[in-house]
Structure formats: C-alpha cells, structure tokens
Amino acid sequence: MKQSKVFIPTMRDVPSEAEAQSHRLLLKSGLIKQSTSGIYSYLPLATRVLNNITAIVRQEMERIDSVEILMPALQQAELWEESGRWGAYGPELMRLQDRHGRQFALGPTHEELVTSIVRNELKSYKQLPMTLFQIQSKFRDEKRPRFGLLRGREFIMKDAYSFHADEASLDQTYQDMYQAYSRIFERVGINARPVVADSGAIGGSHTHEFMALSAIGEDTIVYSKESDYAANIEKAEVVYEPNHKHSTVQPLEKIETPNVKTAQELADFLGRPVDEIVKTMIFKVDGEYIMVLVRGHHEINDIKLKSYFGTDNIELATQDEIVNLVGANPGSLGPVIDKEIKIYADNFVQDLNNLVVGANEDGYHLINVNVGRDFNVDEYGDFRFILEGEKLSDGSGVAHFAEGIEVGQVFKLGTKYSESMNATFLDNQGKAQPLIMGCYGIGISRTLSAIVEQNHDDNGIVWPKSVTPFDLHLISINPKKDDQRELADALYAEFNTKFDVLYDDRQERAGVKFNDADLIGLPLRIVVGKRASEGIVEVKERLTGDSEEVHIDDLMTVITNKYDNLK
C-alpha cells in the first residue's frame, strides 16, 4: 500500500496527560485518535494490528471448539435484574433509557444475555458442553479514564462463555481456555503471566488473570522465584506464624496527641516503630458497622474482607458516618468503645500487647491497651495485603512484586447465572439441573496497548512479526529522481506479491520519512537512495538497528531470510 494513500497522522508532540508510553506512541504514530475522555478511534494502522490480533484469537478459539457469535451491545435491564446485577454492578454500568421509558445497559460483559440465549435451547446433557465467543465493543463508565486504551470507557473484547453438565467438563474447558490464552499472548508478542485473582463483579469460584508485565501496570503481581506461584496481590494469602512480642502488661493510659492523624505520625510522635501501632478502620458490611484492626505498617485488603464475609456489599464508612458513630474523626479511631460493634483483627495483631490505638476522641490516643482486658476481638483472620519479602503460602520462598496490565481473565462461574435466570437442562437421569458455566475474556484493545508497552524503544514502536500492520517499509528517499522512483516502484510490485508492503512514496524530506519509519516500527525497512542507479539498496532491521547494503539481485533472498528469522 502506498503511504501517500494511507491516513497516518503522525505527531511530533503528544498531550501531556498521555502518561503511559503505549498511549504516547499510539497517538504519536497515528494509530489512534481521541474522541473524548476514554474513547478512541482506531486509524488504519491500528485497525490492521487489531485484525492480526483477532485472527490469532479466532484461530486459537476454533482450535478448542469455541464457536463465534455476535450479540448486541445494548442489553435490556430486565436481564440484569434477573441476575441481580442491575443494582449491584454500580456506577460503572452505562445505563440509558429509550423513548418508551425502557431501561437498557451498554454491556461491559454478556453473561446475562448469553444465558438468556441458551436457556431455552440447551435442554439436554447431550448438547453439552458448548462454548460460544464473540469479539465486540464493550462499555464501562470509568470514573477516571487513563493510560489510553488501557483504561477506557469503550474497548474491544473477546468474551467466551461455556456451558456444562458437570464440574469435570467445566474443569476441562477452563484448562483448554487457559492454555489457549497462554498461546495467544505468546503469539502476539506479550510476556504475560497467569496469576490467581479475584472474580470481582462477574462472580464465580475460581479465576486466573493474565498479566502483561509492565512498569505502568495498575495491578501488583506477587510471585515466587523458586516456584510457579503467582497471584494478584489482592488474592495473595499472608502466612501467619506467631511471633509474640509480649511484654509485661502495663496500665491503660490516655495521652494527648495533637495534630496526629496517621500511624506513621503517631509512631514518630511516640518514638516507637510503626509496626507497634494498631490502626482501626470502620466498614459497613451489608449495612452493619464493623471495626477492622491491622498493625501500623500493614494495609487492609477489602477484597479479602469481601471473601471473608461472603458479600460484595462492603464499603469503608464515610467520615460523617464515623463521627456520628463514635464522635471522632478517622485518625482517632480505636477498639476501646462503649458501643455494640463487632471487632475483627488481622492475625498479626495477636503478636502485640500494650497496644497503641486511637481513643475515639480527636487529639488523643490510648497506650498500653490489651485484648481481653480493655476490649475483645470477635475474630482474627487474614485481612491485609502481603508485603514484599514475606513467606508465600505455597512454602516456596518469599514474595516478590512486579507490576502488570491485565490483558485476559478466565472464570469458573458455576451456577451463579443459570440459577438466578432459570437456565436448566435435563441430566442423564432426566432430572432438571442448572447449567454450569465458565466465562473467558481477552481485552483486544488492551492487548494492542500491552504489545506496544512491551515492544518499543526511544524512537518508537517495534512491532512483533505476528501483529505488525505491514511486513516491510519500502522508502524512496527522493521520488522526484527517476532512478529512485523507478526502482522503488519495481521493488514494490515484486515484494507486494509475497509481503504486506508499506511504500513511502511521499514528497517529504528524508529525515521526516526515517523518523516516521522508526515511529511506526515495521520489522524490516528497504531504503532506495543515491545508489539506486547501481541497483544497491539499504536493508535495516527495526529491532536491532542493524543495516546492510544489498544488491537487488539478492534482495528477495536476504529479505526472506531476515523475515523468517524475525520474532
């Protein structure tokens, strides 16, 4: 394709709010253009990359007998009300109303809709298992879109849904999909690591995320260097081994602590290590207030709280709620309280006595507080995030951290949707049973960004061969010169029969063409310049920067060999 005919609006400067390298490079190289916050148009080069990604995805889905369909993005509220997610999903769900007053959502996922499609069709165990997938735009009303395609309000996804008669069948499809995802990410050129994760708003009993390692990743991966253990930090279990630091029990004292609001400020004020301070936070669980205690250097993990209490309806109490409940602001909270409120403490609080806690009075704290004498703990548990260097639950060693971008996730849904939506089949005994489900998502547009995030240098994108928008970049330095133009035209005609060629025939300065070529990042470059009359051209590899002069008689062999050896 001739570059003069392709819409590639490269930029010299990018908006300052473009923080991620992938966002900056996708804008700068003319692959995407922002419409409004969190919403982008995919321009010709990006569309070609997306087509290459989806072709790989389709191949791997068909390899495991997953069948493609296409469902509407617009979903009626009644389906979401059946599953209970219309009220539970939260403000991220894009809701709208038609002229007749009917409520709809622009789908972030399609569990409800696909369940409604199959519930009157898959009626016998003989029809199972069945796996359906689609590739489609999704919508989520992100509060703060950022990082370009990595956290947008409209995005492209591959979502698949499987239906089973028993858990063994679900396990097999889950494993097949897990392996397919591993192959997909390897093929598109992403270093992605599967990690144990939380199922979030989709629900289900078991899930893995596929995380593309990246410094700008919004998720922290906990992993072992001695085993294949890997988990999202939200799910990483903290191993408790008692390490009591008990001293002689001291009398309870109330001390003045002016302008002290955080655990670190309190530790500095008292001249004590922060891990000897105990923080108190108040949450609402299904509308009931509870207190949760952790040591000063630890952070409460609300995902673990949701798992512990078996509900998603957990939120941190607001400042007004806290003041109304205990008469003090959040920085002064403590468990010594004359109100009926259940108290839960992280396991590691047990290692301390003579605790330092808030006095439930602004400007004051209590020291030498002891469990059993001054207050009681209803239950201990693992309520916090793991720290780097702590022991891992598989016994393999200690926790190491890395940042990652979630590009895919696989879920075992069980009967969450089939039971609430009455999707049943007859088993081999003729008894009605709820369909057992799995769901499996890949962020296609996220994958595009993740590829760029992991495959770039200071000059621009470096596309992996499998997804590159074109194989070769043919550049005529000066098309006004007959010998250069004629040779470039001839090479374009020859190489276009075997490769996808982007032919830069523009009337631009050589420096502009070379800068754009580096920015766009096609794997191989053929430059027709001042030695065209001798039949000599330059061949350059984008990844290594290696270049050599080649006679046109040898050019097809050289290019073919180089292309075959590309990653």
Curated annotation (Swiss-Prot):
Its EC number is 6.1.1.15. One of its GO terms (biological process) is prolyl-tRNA aminoacylation. Its main location: cytoplasm. Gene3D superfamilies: Anticodon-binding domain, Bira Bifunctional Protein, Domain 2, YbaK/aminoacyl-tRNA synthetase-associated domain. One of its GO terms (molecular function) is catalytic activity, acting on a protein. It is found in: Cytoplasm. Keywords: Aminoacyl-tRNA synthetase, ATP-binding, Cytoplasm, Ligase, Nucleotide-binding, Protein biosynthesis. The keyword Cell cycle does not apply. The keyword Magnesium does not apply. One of its GO terms (cellular component) is cytosol. Pfam families: HGTP_anticodon (PF03129), tRNA-synt_2b (PF00587), tRNA_edit (PF04073). It catalyses: tRNA(Pro) + L-proline + ATP = L-prolyl-tRNA(Pro) + AMP + diphosphate. InterPro entries: aa-tRNA-synt_IIb (IPR002314), aa-tRNA-synth_II (IPR006195), aa-tRNA-synth_II/BPL/LPL (IPR045864), Anticodon-bd (IPR004154), Anticodon-bd_dom_sf (IPR036621), Pro-tRNA-ligase_IIa (IPR002316), Pro-tRNA-synth_IIa_bac-type (IPR004500), Pro-tRNA-Synthase_IIa_type1 (IPR023717). It is an enzyme of class 6 (ligase). NCBIfam families: PRK09194.1, proS_fam_II. Catalyzes the attachment of proline to tRNA(Pro) in a two-step reaction: proline is first activated by ATP to form Pro-AMP and then transferred to the acceptor end of tRNA(Pro). As ProRS can inadvertently accommodate and process non-cognate amino acids such as alanine and cysteine, to avoid such errors it has two additional distinct editing activities against alanine. One activity is designated as 'pretransfer' editing and involves the tRNA(Pro)-independent hydrolysis of activated Ala-AMP. Belongs to the class-II aminoacyl-tRNA synthetase family. ProS type 1 subfamily. Homodimer. Consists of three domains: the N-terminal catalytic domain, the editing domain and the C-terminal anticodon-binding domain. This is Proline--tRNA ligase. It comes from Staphylococcus aureus (strain JH9).
